[in-house]
Swiss-Prot record:
Keywords recorded for this protein, A-Z: DNA-directed RNA polymerase, Nucleotidyltransferase, Transcription, Transferase
UniProt KW Transcription keyword: yes
Stretch forming the signal peptide: none
Subunit structure: The RNAP catalytic core consists of 2 alpha, 1 beta, 1 beta' and 1 omega subunit. When a sigma factor is associated with the core the holoenzyme is formed, which can initiate transcription.
Official protein name in the record: DNA-directed RNA polymerase subunit omega
Amino acid sequence: MARVTVEDCLEHVDNRFELVMLSTKRARQLATGGKEPKLAWENDKPTVMALREIAAGVMDYSVIAEAEIVEDEPLFAAFEDESNEAV
């Protein structure tokens, strides 16, 4: 298992905040079994695997965005049928 450093990952993302957001989303994909790893899985935890993928340059927001499904729902759709009168 190769050691992953923040500096290795920052070569492929703009800042630490973006690194945290990207690695979190990717680790969740790997942990839930939704996506296959892009590198050989070396008995690492999903978070380490996500960081290894970012450090290798095979994972970025464009790959994550392809996998995300965003459904547009009205914020207050559940309350449309209720009246606004005070009780």
